[in-house]
Amino acid sequence: MSCLCNAVVFEGEESMSGPVVECVPNFSEGTDARRVGAIVAAMRVPGVHLLDWSMDAAHNRSVVTVAGDPASVVESAVRGACKAAQLIDLTRQQGVHPRIGAADVIPFVPISGIKLEQCAMLARQAGQEIWHRCKVPVFLYGAAAARPDRANLEEVRRGQFEGLREAVVKESSRRPDIGGPGLHPTAGACAVGARKFLVAYNIYFDSADVAMVRAIAREIRAASGGLKGVRAMGVLAQGRAQLAMDITDLEGTPLSSVFRTVTDLARRHKALPVEGEVIGLLPEAACERESDWMRQLTGFDEQTKILERRLAAPLAWPGGP
């Protein structure tokens, strides 16, 4: 696994000579800013830098990005998962985005001086700690998967919280890798894994036709024989059809290729993409500044949304110094 950054310099520090790991927890809460802020604040650990966090009310989901030395990042992720288990009750909400837990997905990503296989070990350590501290069972996925069928995150989340809660009782093959056998009554389970860098990219259309955008999602997702390394779902967000995608292979499937394919498919339905957004951070190598897809991005500030620049100037943690 090649590194995204060879030298990582943090604000107020000359350099970070050791390995750098990124972690991008996804929490099943996107409407309550105080609750999400408390989860983010709980993740503050010496040696960990806050790179990005955002809330998405349409998907009822928040995404946090942190980076730092491996041991500290593991501790940060575990604290965030346990705080989420305290504050989020899945029995009182419905997730628009597929989810199985309050702290739904916690991936570890190699940035500098560390390999994907080592990140898989960190994921397993984090999973053990999450179960030990807050009794939320864990499914291991991606490069950390304990079983081949669980390398695919979609398979792990099949049925969502409501369906999985029943499945683990009836089917031993659906039970967690760590803890259990049942789910936490209100916080569900947590998928913890290791993966390469991923870009979350959403496209909005000049249409409210959900059937149309779901048809496009089926055609482009890798699982249906579409674009390599693409996961996609179609939803109605803010009164518009939205294609929500995870791009897991930026070298094999650059974002310009995704945008062209989506545009061609939309034209068949007499629709056009009118706006795009990146959730989280984008590596410098993925930027194509003269491309149509980048011109359509909203809220994209290169100083805050490009990984390498954010690593050099991390955010202040909520709650003050």
Segments predicted by a language model, with ranges:
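Long, contiguous binding/interaction regions
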Residues: S17-P321
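Cysteine-centered motifs
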Residues: C3-C5
